[in-house]
Amino acid sequence: MIAFQDAPGQLPDGHRVYAIGDIHGCADRLWELHAAIAEDLAARPTAHPLLVHVGDYVDRGPDSAGVVQRLAAGNPLPSVPTVNLMGNHERTMIDALDGAGASATDWMISGGREALTSWGGDPDAARTTWRAHVPDADMTFLRGLALRHQVGGYLFVHAGIRPGVTLSVQTDQDLLTIRNSFLYSEQDFGVVVVHGHTPRIAPEIRFNRIGIDTGAVFNGKLTCAVLEGCSVGFIQT
């Protein structure tokens, strides 16, 4: 049973959001979490469920390809709409496979070796050979990832937002990579930001944000925030 507590934001009646943090190639954990969400929905049906993945599907873990291909295949939960957001690791992977030399180096040192290997590629082979191992359908999925999604009083992004900057003009770089100036901000953003990117031992609930990266790939948990009405709970695998 999910233990709910007061949330800093609110969703309209009949709406429930399941938001999953950074996956990083931990495919088995993701399958288990999807199954747990399905069980919760069967026990507690709701009119308007939504599944959100906040990005960083690839790198570090053993099965980036499996994660991407599962999500690219369509809604993992039947009849539950799904929003897939981009993380900084997807952005780096895309740029690396498009031939950006600096991004290729960054990708390899931030977990890209494991990711490329999961697609059958050789990280030590010429960089010009890498792209051929990643199917076009997977690249199309990655390129089409959204940067943000808002429901009720919640804004879902990968990393966070720049305090003092209007939501409509936030830069891609900040949405994908921001840390301290967002994490330690005492500003009311006008929405509660649900984000990943910065791993913590447990989910973080602040008045202006909820952090759900709990370091699954670093022997932590894969976390799903369950948002409903004025409450929040968590499912972990």
Question: Could you describe each region identified by the protein language model?
Answer:
Residues 31-32, 65-66, 97-98, 168-169, ...:
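Short amphipathic alpha-helical segments
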Residues 106-211, 215-221, 227-237:
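Acidic, His/Gly-enriched loop-helix segments that form or flank divalent-metal centers
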Residues 1-32:
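Short glycine- and acidic-rich boundary segments immediately preceding or forming the N-terminal edge
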Residues 3-13, 42-44, 72-76, 147-150, ...:
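A short acidic-Thr-Gly-centered motif at the start of a beta-strand
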Residues 14, 46-48, 79-81, 152, ...:
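A general structural motif
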Residues 25-28, 59-62, 89-94, 163-164, ...:
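Active-site environment of divalent metal-dependent phosphoester hydrolases
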Residues 19-21, 53, 84, 156-157, ...:
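Short hydrophobic beta-strand that contains or immediately precedes a catalytic carboxylate
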Residues 26-105:
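Core catalytic region of metal-dependent phosphoesterases/phosphodiesterases
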